[in-house]
Amino acid sequence: MIRLQHVSMVFGAGPSQVAALTDISFHVAKGEFVVLTGPSGAGKTTLLRLLYRAESPSEGDIDVAGFDVSALRRSEIPRLRRSIGIVFQDAKLLAGRTVFENVAFVLRVLGTPRREITPKAFAALKAVGLSARAQAFPHQLSQGEAQRASLARAIVKSPGLLLADEPTGNLDEEMAGEILGLVKDIWSRGTTVVFATHQARLVPHLRRRTLRLEGGRLVKDEG
């Protein structure tokens, strides 16, 4: 599902050059749940951005879901992203749209037949326990509810890969546990998951393979 070979990422040039990632190599099998951990600034977000081609690597090869991401043409990026669901630390919901409309919007962009949009959107909301809040607007949601909506939006297109970038970073322990449980439920249905977190207390609860970044380098791969 994911393969990185000797991937490095450098920002800037000359004396101001900063190495965000250095010589990263690993493989994630289809259906695997991988925890990407490390302190803030270790390179976790940069690595995820490379996977969905928000950034291009300075060196190395990246393959994701059958796409040669490092050589992908700009016109092919939307095809890659159709196979990936993404959840951020900030839910990034559209402020002027209801929870249902936020989720359904993804399907409309993908050209889903109109008759399929409503049942698929409600199925995604049901999966994250948010059906009762379908007509609420983002400003009416708690932080936990907003992340549930973000998760529903990520899974509504039935992606083969879910990238979760610090989705529990702004949540208290109880809410974080709920989101974590939902992500594990999604994984149990066959979705490959890469879950990034700097919260060391979460890692033992996940009990999954762990990749640890420090200073832009992969220093541990275990589990």
Predicted regions span which residues?
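Short coil-to-helix segment of the ABC ATPase nucleotide-binding domain corresponding to the Q-loop/switch region
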Residues: 97-105
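Helix-to-loop junction immediately C-terminal to a conserved catalytic motif
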Residues: 52
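Conserved ABC transporter NBD signature motif
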Residues: 60-68, 80
